Amino acid sequence: MTDSITDLQSDQRPDRSYDFASAERRWQLAWTERACFTVPDVPDPGARTYYVLEMFPYPSGQIHMGHVRNYTLGDVVARYKRAQGYQVLHPMGWDAFGLPAENAARERGVHPGQWTWNNIAAMRGELQRMGLSITWEREFATCDPSYYGHQQALFLDFLKKNLVERRESWVNWDPVDETVLANEQVIDGKGWRSGAPVERKKLSQWFLRITDYAEELLAGLDQLDRWPERVRVMQSRWIGRSEGARLRFPLVEPLGDQREIEVYTTRPDTLYGMSFVAIAADHPVAAALAAHHPALAAFVAECRSLGTSEAAIEAAEKRGFDTGLRVKHPFCDETFPVWIANFVLMDYGTGAVFGCPAHDQRDLDFARKYDLSVTPVVLPSDQDAASFTIGRKAYDGDGILFNSGPFDGLTPDAARREAITRLEAMGWGQGVTNWRLRDWGVSRQRYWGCPIPIIHCDQCGPVPVPADQLPVTLPEDVTFDRPGNPLDHHPSWKHVTCPSCGAAAVRETDTFDTFVDSSWYFARFASPHAHVPVLKEAAQNWLPVDQYIGGIEHAILHLLYARFFTRAMADTGHVPVREPFAGLFTQGMVTHESYRAADGRWLSPVEVTRHGETVVETATGEPVQVGRGEKMSKSKRNTVAPGEIFNRYGADAARWFILSDNPPERDMEWTDAGAVGAYRFVQRLYRLAEAVARIAKEETNRDDASSDAAMTLRRMTHRTVAAVTEALEGFNFNVAVARVYEFANALTEAEKKAAEPGMTAARVEAITLLSRIIAPMMPHLAEEMATLIEQGPKLVAEQVWPSADPALLVVQSVTIAIQVMGKLRATLDISPDADQDSVIAQAEADPNVVRALEGKRVVKRIYVPNRIVNFVIAG
């Protein structure tokens, strides 16, 4: 038998007693008509509120399986909390500005706005097919002036609070496209679109002063106990607090007004091991020298082609240029060379470092390359000072200082403190706290973004746009037929009158980094139609977000910017909280096998066919190479279209498989077999409910007595309710799925004893409660099952979460193993409360155990409560 990897023909399916397509449409309409998911901006006093939010999507045009997983997880939480009696805010919006829309305009001749809104319509339809319990009336897109106008107002409030600054900074400049490139858009030193060599260029940029909050952002991580530890660690490292020293090295020969080079270091204890000073290519000393040294100027230009990110600089080969300058050591009479190095960043510390090759690998590699001295000054505890040398690896461990004059014999920590004390006493430096975090440059030279609400006047300088003139909207009549920012080229949009003096002026043509749009959207959802950015009463009730869900790839920038924005909004009177997200869950990726033809072409799942263990290209019959499950990507064509999955198996089956495969924080592999299995399970549950409903209608005389079989089923029902509740509380959704599978097996077994007293009532109860506990995961099927057994006028979506009967959770008996010398001889059913002596006595009386112990001397009796008895015999 052969079948397409992603296709399941109708004749391969079991009988479809459950028409998922019509059921899903019917129940989605019912939820909408009854406003099941609508909540007010300001809930009634005393109402319990819960805010669950998944990171909103970029409207690329179609959802992918990663979206399906993300929004399924959030919907489970939202439906579960709603059933628990909470008023649940579960909104959806669109992160709608960004470069892809401009690329579409250039490549396809369609306006970015039209492209974006068409994509939103398509993706909204696909998301609605999932049956998400979204409050759709709160939907917005960040490209709508009704949203970004409030963003402009926030920016101006931040400006008044001195949280905004305009200054020059180095950027990656594409000279062909005439635009600034983000670090990730620089590929091997070239622009990702134009292929032109990238230049580092100084431009005036707007910055948000996130560094003002560095200390608070770092300290606040300790309070986020419902965030993954690895995310908190990543943010802590990004903020990067370090204790060190700023020290000044006098130049042996002054360079104009430059008489010294200031260095920041976290290791002043290693000063006696210094070998050189390295400065950034953008350092003032380098600039002064470049004006008169062509070779040095060429090296500086080469450094500027690396890009501005730490990652790009770290990955590049470490290279340097000897300036010929030398500096004096603060503690001795030695002098050391000054090099320009391509690994030193101007915007970290002071733009200069001293190199201690013996105890820093990067410095050691540099020193070996340029034949600079290497002097160890920290001696490992197991080494001898006379023989210790540095080979290919720098030593960065603990030890005792040597070769360090007055610091000899001190630990590195003690030497660090002593070095700072001496530097301060000599006037050559001081201890300081430094931060890796840099202020956030938010200027982008693009059209499709939120306009920065500033007007530039030759007389007044930068002037804020008056509040009554917001929003500053984008012009519609733009063209993309030339490089650069269309706003710069527009004939009229930027030409305005200065609001302060009335003179001719121009608008700011830069737009905001799209991370600004996503740094406060969660707050807008609390009152999306308010005349202010956030209605204070709504923020008081809904913020912070109780549960935020999204990918680990946003662990640093988006989450850190949102934490900063929340603090800035609090300090400007907009929100009453300082943290945006009380709880954070980072889900794993959805992966899929990849398929490659013999000629190297990547094939999509619909282009291959499986013959047992062999996979071939359907068109040619040739075998294909099957790759391991990896992230779905267009480049490898291993994507699966959610819409096709919904058509074939239904939304509930897709949701069920998404939840069942792995713990949600891990990656999951999408497989055809898994989707088929989920589809069949949906059909199986429906048939179980159908059978119970039929018997319940036929049976007129119900016996109030309950047989052992009925009580066994009831106990299983309530234990399942308790187990699923516990699993959902702990985000162990795959465990909840497993418990439902077990319960379905128990229901199937119960069919064999359908005639026993009380069994019909027990089965009706089982289906009733089952429909409630699967509702967060398979909401359409839950409604359909409840209808079959005529549950009542309320929808399952309106029902309260069931509580397990404590009396039915009590374990009546447990089965334990009886072993002799570790070998199983018998089993024994006992009360879970039975004492050890009685259990051992019962075990010793078992005939099989009696025979095994006959003529033997028992030297030890081991009892593990409710699990095992083991008899140890002599010899």
From Swiss-Prot:
GO terms for cellular component: cytosol. Keywords: Aminoacyl-tRNA synthetase, ATP-binding, Cytoplasm, Ligase, Nucleotide-binding, Protein biosynthesis. CDD domains: Anticodon_Ia_Leu_BEm (cd07958), LeuRS_core (cd00812). A motif ('HIGH' region) lies at residues 57-67. Its EC number is 6.1.1.4. It holds the Pfam family tRNA-synt_1_2. It is found in: Cytoplasm. ATP binds at K634. A motif ('KMSKS' region) lies at residues 631-635. Its main location: cytoplasm. It catalyses: tRNA(Leu) + L-leucine + ATP = L-leucyl-tRNA(Leu) + AMP + diphosphate. GO terms for biological process: leucyl-tRNA aminoacylation. InterPro entries: aa-tRNA-synth_I_CS, aa-tRNA-synth_Ia, Leu-tRNA-ligase, Leu_tRNA-synth_edit, M/V/L/I-tRNA-synth_anticd-bd, Methionyl/Leucyl_tRNA_Synth, Rossmann-like_a/b/a_fold, tRNAsynth_Ia_anticodon-bd. Belongs to the class-I aminoacyl-tRNA synthetase family. HAMAP family: Leu_tRNA_synth_B (MF_00049_B). This is Leucine--tRNA ligase.
